[in-house]
Regions:
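N-terminal secretory signal peptides and thylakoid transit peptides that target proteins
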Residues: 1-17
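Intrinsically disordered, low-complexity segments enriched in polar/charged small residues
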Residues: 8-9, 29, 33, 141, ...
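C-terminal segment of N-terminal export signals and the immediately downstream linker at the start
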Residues: 1, 17-57
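Mature-region segments of soluble proteins
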Residues: 36-37, 47-54, 65-222
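Low-complexity, intrinsically disordered/propeptide-like segments
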Residues: 10-12, 22, 209, 218
Length: 222
């Protein structure tokens, strides 16, 4: 697994994300803050990670209603997915014939692996993270009909609302945004304790479930 490059993220944005100590000097994914944590990249190069983070933040921006892709660490989620079996197309039937103009509900039907789609697509977004928000939106509209944008948009939503065990939804900000309590085993105790009250339980991750510490998604990375 490649650990030569890594991101620096704000602890305020990504509460609960594991700190990795590496020898190389970190670079900033977002503006410098008082505290930061370093997260190794497993697939993206540093420039690619900056572009993906900026693009995801335009697809799912934070606003007055709550956090967005930046706070959820979506770029880390996508990096982990591409580094794992999904990025290498382990889960998809990849032999011919390939459908032309397939309906959107069929999902991605191309020959290239997700890794290849991202690598090629990111070439067209060189310098994207240096553009203004208006310029970024215009650039994304230009590629809106491409397989790359379809994957990026899908992965951004996944990274917002996945279980944090997969690298996104940091501190369960996505679940808190929509009021999802997570994969709870039972609500009996809360029903008895808060009977007759308006109650929204704090979300819990798979990692907090019995045996959750043994779950290691994506460990067959190259």
């Amino acid at each position: 697994m490649r650990r030569r490059e890594f991101l620096t993220l704000s602890t305020a944005s990504l509460g609960g994300v594991l700190l990795y100590s590496l020898d190389r000097k970190p670079f900033r994914l977002f503006a410098q803050t008082a505290q930061s944590i370093r997260i190794p990249l497993r697939f993206f190069t540093q420039p690619e990670a900056l572009i993906v983070a900026a693009a995801a933040s335009r697809i799912f921006p934070s606003d007055e209603t709550g956090p967005g892709a930046q706070e959820a660490g979506v770029a880390i989620y996508i990096d982990r997915q591409l580094a794992g079996p999904w990025g290498r197309d382990r889960y998809r039937y990849t032999r011919e014939p390939f459908a032309e103009n397939a309906p959107a509900e069929f999902g991605y039907q191309g020959r290239a692996t997700p890794r290849q789609v991202y690598r090629e697509g990111l070439k067209d977004l060189k310098g994207f993270d240096q553009l203004s928000s208006v310029e970024q939106d215009n650039k994304l509209r230009q590629i809106e009909g491409t397989p790359f944008f379809s994957l990026l948009r899908r992965n951004t939503v996944e990274g917002m609302f996945c279980d944090p065990i997969h690298g996104g939804n940091a501190d369960m900000v996505g679940w808190q945004l929509i009021g999802y309590p997570g994969p709870r085993m039972s609500n009996y105790a809360d029903v008895d304790k808060h009977f007759g009250e308006a109650f929204r339980p704090k979300p819990v991750s798979l990692r907090e479930m019995p045996g959750g510490d043994k779950f290691r998604p994506g460990e067959d990375e190259e």
